[in-house]
Amino acid sequence: MDLKSAIRTIPDYPEPGIQFRDVTTLIGDARAFRVAIDRMVQPWAGAKIDKVAGTEARGFILGGAVAHQLSVGFVPVRKRGKLPWRTLREDYELEYGQDTIEIHVDAIAEGDRVLLVDDLIATGGTAEASIKLLQRAGATVVGATFIIDLPELGGAERIEAMGVPVSSLVAYEGT
């Protein structure tokens, strides 16, 4: 199945010149969603994975499904202030400012082997911050998987430079 055909492109969103890749159409299509999850799991099926971590918000949907397929637990990587208990946090730079992500202090056990899941990798800033946070919590991040890669923005290369293998299902040239 051609997964690109299940992803809606919205021109000039959220600002002029940006081509927004909307995976909500993919996850709303039962067949495309199933194919995407199966393909996200496949490269990691033989790896020993203890947990899947997914970044807010679409990474929750995808990561939960991947964790289910792998029969492992799920760790939500949330925006600051959204988790109700004690947290570890990681600040990271955005194009215009800074943001913070968090996980609960007990979400990861020392030595847990974790797969990071999100819908899209662009510059890699959020993925890098997530990996640093998971590593600080004691995890070994065994890989990162995405539906979409925007290779011109260099995110996958940035994550691979951290020693974390990356897989993605489709690539779009340009932004």
Swiss-Prot record:
HAMAP family in the record, alphabetically?
A: Aden_phosphoribosyltr
Gene Ontology MF annotations:
adenine binding; adenine phosphoribosyltransferase activity; AMP binding
**So, what pathway does this thing act in?**
Purine metabolism; AMP biosynthesis via salvage pathway; AMP from adenine: step 1/1
Query: Which PANTHER family does the entry mention?
Result: ADENINE PHOSPHORIBOSYLTRANSFERASE
Q: Name one GO biological process term.
A: AMP salvage
According to its UniProt record, where is this protein located? Cytoplasm
| Keywords from the named record | Cytoplasm, Glycosyltransferase, Purine salvage, Transferase
Using the UniProt record, give the first listed, main subcellular location.
cytoplasm
Does NAD show up as a keyword for this record?
no
* Catalytic class of the enzyme: transferase
Q: What does this protein do?
A: Catalyzes a salvage reaction resulting in the formation of AMP, that is energically less costly than de novo synthesis.
Species of provenance: Maricaulis maris (strain MCS10) (Caulobacter maris)
Kindly provide the name given to this protein in its UniProt entry.
Answer: Adenine phosphoribosyltransferase
* Subunit structure of this chain's protein: Homodimer.
Q: Which InterPro entries match?
A: Ade_phspho_trans, PRibTrfase_dom, PRTase-like, UPRTase/APRTase
Pfam families named among the record's database cross-references? Pribosyltran
Task: Kindly list the GO CC terms recorded for this protein.
Answer: cytoplasm
Q: Which family does it belong to?
A: Belongs to the purine/pyrimidine phosphoribosyltransferase family.
E.C. designation(s): 2.4.2.7
Catalytic reaction(s) noted:
AMP + diphosphate = 5-phospho-alpha-D-ribose 1-diphosphate + adenine
